[in-house]
Amino acid sequence: MSFRHTSVMPDQAVALLNCEKGKIVADCTLGGGGHAVRIAEQILPEGLLIGIDKDPAALAHAKQALSVFGERVLYVRGNFADFSEILSSLDIPAVDGVLLDLGLSFYQIDGSGRGFSFRKDEPLDMRMDPDQSLTAADLVNQSAEADLVRIFREFGEERYASRIARRIVEARRSAPVTTSGQLARIVTDAYPAKERHTAKIDPATRVFMALRIAVNTELENLERFLDTVIDRIKPGGRICVLSFHSLEDRMVKRRMKLWEKACVCPPGLPVCSCSKQRECRIVTRKALVPTAEEVQANPMARSVRLRAAEKV
């Protein structure tokens, strides 16, 4: 299957980056290159675009989409969590703009064959980086029941985490759970009968999201990225983040507020002792959301939140 993906909120995200000719911009989740093409059109040929992705299929497609821009685009197969190290390896001290899109591509969900979708019956894999060893099947079949409860509750905010974990443990006593279809049926059966057909989202939605987050250490990666990225942005440069669930969005919102603070001393101290300097100005006081028209055209955009900050 060819790589298919529609970038979410591309015009708003690229506009917030303040792209201009000659700037250096990093797209830390290159995907199919939808955002990157728009960025490249605005900063090249004088500027430089750095495209990072750990999925080799995404990188291959992006290289085709961006081939017209030639050597002014640098491609890096890597994890956005290692952004600072990647810049060091390229001998680039700082950039003018950073874009991070935390969503899955349509290809990953529908065409990768890695079990991201509960609507398909595929190997229960869920790795964004196929070279990684841990799979969703490993977690489902080897984790203790208590650990499954924690994963579903912490990463999926799933109210029936205990019931679902118990059903999984019961099912795997007979045979390993190896496909996305198997897991989806187990989760649906674990739900109270009255809620299976009345819930606004499919019963398997939160469990699949939780497993994907756990397999790919998504929240840990985001934390590592946020720990260092602001130091790699030039004064006046901007960072834009597209989050697709509340856990990510809360992390980004809190970190931007922390960057904006000039002092983080406990309240009541007569004199500041932390010596913290204000690092950014928040550009989006309230997260931007897609229009109803975009959601209708691209349902994957439904939950996205876009936040931006400017380095001072």
Curated annotation (Swiss-Prot):
Q: Is Cell division tagged as a keyword?
A: no
| Cellular-component GO terms for this entry | cytoplasm
Catalysed reactions, as listed in the record: cytidine(1402) in 16S rRNA + S-adenosyl-L-methionine = N(4)-methylcytidine(1402) in 16S rRNA + S-adenosyl-L-homocysteine + H(+)
Q: Which InterPro entries match?
A: RsmH, SAM-dep_MeTrfase_MraW_recog, SAM-dependent_MTases_sf
Instruction: Please state what class of enzyme this protein is.
Output: transferase
EC number, UniProt record: 2.1.1.199
Binding positions for S-adenosyl-L-methionine? 33-35, 53, 80, 101, 108
GO MF annotation terms: rRNA (cytosine-N4-)-methyltransferase activity
Does this entry carry the keyword Cytoplasm?
yes
Segments traversing the membrane: none
Keyword annotations for this protein, in alphabetical order, are: Cytoplasm, Methyltransferase, rRNA processing, S-adenosyl-L-methionine, Transferase
Extract the SUPFAM superfamilies matched here: Putative methyltransferase TM0872, insert domain, S-adenosyl-L-methionine-dependent methyltransferases
Report the superkingdom from the record.
Bacteria
Q: Which GO terms describe its biological process?
A: rRNA base methylation
Q: What is its main location?
A: cytoplasm
Tell where it localizes.
Answer: Cytoplasm
Its job: Specifically methylates the N4 position of cytidine in position 1402 (C1402) of 16S rRNA.
Family designation: Belongs to the methyltransferase superfamily. RsmH family.
> Would you tell me the protein name for this molecule?
Ribosomal RNA small subunit methyltransferase H
Primary gene name: rsmH
